[in-house]
From Swiss-Prot:
Residues 356-471 form the CUB domain. This is Zinc metalloproteinase nas-23. Residues 1-16 form the signal peptide. It is an enzyme of class 3 (hydrolase). Its main location: secreted. Binds 1 zinc ion per subunit. Zn(2+) binds at H207, H211, H217. Metalloprotease. InterPro entries: Astacin-like_dom, CUB_dom, EGF-like_dom, MetalloPept_cat_dom_sf, Peptidase_M12A, Peptidase_Metallo, Sperma_CUB_dom_sf. It comes from Caenorhabditis elegans. Its EC number is 3.4.24.-. It comes from the Eukaryota. The gene is nas-23. It is found in: Secreted.
Amino acid sequence: MRFLILVLAGSIGIYGVNLPKIPKLSDLVNPFQQFKLKDILSTLTALDTPDIAADSAGVSLPKHEYTDRLSSISDLNRSKRDLLFQGDIHLSFEHLSNIVREQLDHSRTKRTAFRNAMYPKTIWLPNVPFELHGSLSAKSRSSLVAAMAFWEKHTCVAFKKRTSEKVYLLMSGQEEGCWSTVGRDEAQGAQILNIGTGCEMFGITSHEIAHALGLFHEQSRYDRDNYVQIVKSRIAQTNFYDFAVVGKKNMETYGQKYDIGSVMHYRPTEFSLDGGNSIIAKDVNMQNTMGQFRGPSFIDVAKINRHYNCEKNCKNKITCLNGGYQHPKNCKICVCPPGYGGSDCKGIEASSPAKCTGVLVAGETQRKFTANIKPNKNAKGIRKCNYHIEAPPGKRIVIIVDSVIGNCVQGCYEEGVELKMYEDKTVTGARFCCKLQKPQTLISQGNTVPLMLVAGKAQAFVQLRYSTVDGPQNRSPKDGNATSIGVNPFLLEKYQDNSIDSEAIRKEYHIQSDNVNQEDFETLVRSEFIDENTADI
């Protein structure tokens, strides 16, 4: 990684001098062919996607006043939407034809990385040749360097300044918007990755490079309808094309679970006609996890490592628990999911500052936990408090989130709290960063819940209650979606008979939150429950 940065820093002055003229996106796409395929795919997607009305009770989620003013990638690419697949992907006619053909065959079965019959020719081996074009702004160049360094550090992928390679990544800022190809394509030669004005943040450049390495969007997975619902009435019919599913012949998930917190996932308002949610999480507690721009998630990185066969670097295997795996560049250590740490990923991830950590033991008696990371304009990097809420074997954990202070942004990737309620700890958890209109009730699948309070320079605060409940640990809806108790009954099939109703839990704890405003409710909570665990950083 250090070599990469030094090479780039020393080469800034010469980039763009002798580069060939870059064709425009409109030169690379045959409009007649593209529009014909787009119409077919839009029709197929409309027919194949379950419907839900924009005004149904299932879509009436709380509306937040988001503090971020960042445009979505599809908005940044508004002028080029007709030429791009799913808002920011340039596909060759042949590649797009294969996706349409597979949809026509209705062959949706398990397989988000681009993998077809040409694999492994569709991945970059032994390295990724690249050029940084002189049209890139200083901010875009710096962000691309950081994104390449990230992928180099966390995977076995290596980036190399192009010499004479005919197939390479040509990173440009010549046009508006942010877009890329998917995987390596010999037929294209110079594969353009465009980072225009407004696309300079790390979350976007790492997203576009992930496309170039082979990742499709997360919501285009074959199984996405088990986890999210598309609100078709909020999407123009011509944009149904952008919500198409990519089938197994062109995509591989490598056994990784669907991750709403993936940097490759659409924002909840993507392509929305009225600014409302066009994508609804079937587990309503996961809605604010969708659309983060912090950077690649644990599963995003794991998929690239699998896609490039990085595990082959480690001949001597070590034990990594909770979904962790050997680091492809240091086989003596484990890469652990967020919230976990230690030599084998069995322990708690190290906190910063170190004093805000520990195990919170859940029992039948309800306990309250409060954590507060104070604002600090001089803070450098991420401040993070990590806890594990643990219950005895055979028990599950009920958590009621009463109050949150954070930076209310889509994806809650700045200040906020994350709770991992699923049995699979590799999946991004339920995030909260906006003011709650009423307490949020969740129930775990297992007997451990990692709790992560994250802040930059601003404040992050959470107050919640937790206790145990009897029941089988692997409770899940019949459609296969793994969820916590915060499930929207209008979107899911009925739970199995051993399920627990969230309203019943609220009544059990005498919480009449619907009859009081948030401020009065917080006063009520503070007066009736004793703080047993408090962290003030």
